[in-house]
Amino acid sequence: MSRSKKSRKPGTNSNDQLVVVRTRSESELESRLRKKLKKRKGLKSGSRHSEGSESQVRQAAQKRDPRLGSKKPIPLIVAEPKKLNKQERKLAAEQELAMLEKDAQLNVLLDRLDNGEKLGIGLQKYVDEKLDRIEVLMEQLGLLDDEPEPAPAPQSKPTKKRKTEDDLLSEFEQLDVDKYQD
């Protein structure tokens, strides 16, 4: 029979406590393992390019997202835009004109102008641009009357004749300067 030792732990004087019995072979094995682990402090031996890394590269290639990279061909030359014929341009102009006539914001601003309100610079610019575009479209479609708008009636202020240089000079010479001194 092999020899067994009792372990000595402080406070184990009483017989009630558990006694640990170790055999010599167990303690030798434990000490060898501890010594072996103590010696190995660095990394495992081997080269950087081990066979295990090749399998990792293959796995990484398989895990790649299939959405990366499109198989759709990309045109290298920009195609020229298709030109519209007269009929298509006329339809497009009619649609744009109808859209401008239905523009709610433009209608509200025109109503405000009719009521005599003054618009801000930005709003007035917006109204002018839209009205100019409507005029161009109507001209393209042949809806615009060629008659010029009637000129506004002249105001009731009497118009003065333009004075000649001689009249202005005589008026200046007759001017009483003392009247303007304080």
UniProtKB/Swiss-Prot annotation:
Positions of region (Disordered): 1-79, 143-182
Compositionally skewed regions (Basic and acidic residues) per UniProt: 23-32
Assembly notes: Interacts with Der.
Family membership noted in the UniProt record: Belongs to the YihI family.
Record HAMAP family: GAP_YihI
A GO term, aspect molecular function: GTPase activator activity
Bias-annotated ranges (Basic residues): 33-47
Signal peptide per UniProt: none
Protein name as it appears in the record: Der GTPase-activating protein YihI
Summary of the function given for this chain in its UniProt record: A GTPase-activating protein (GAP) that modifies Der/EngA GTPase function. May play a role in ribosome biogenesis.
UniProt keyword list: GTPase activation, Ribosome biogenesis
Pfam families the record matches: YihI
UniProt GO BP: ribosome biogenesis
Superkingdom of origin organism: Bacteria
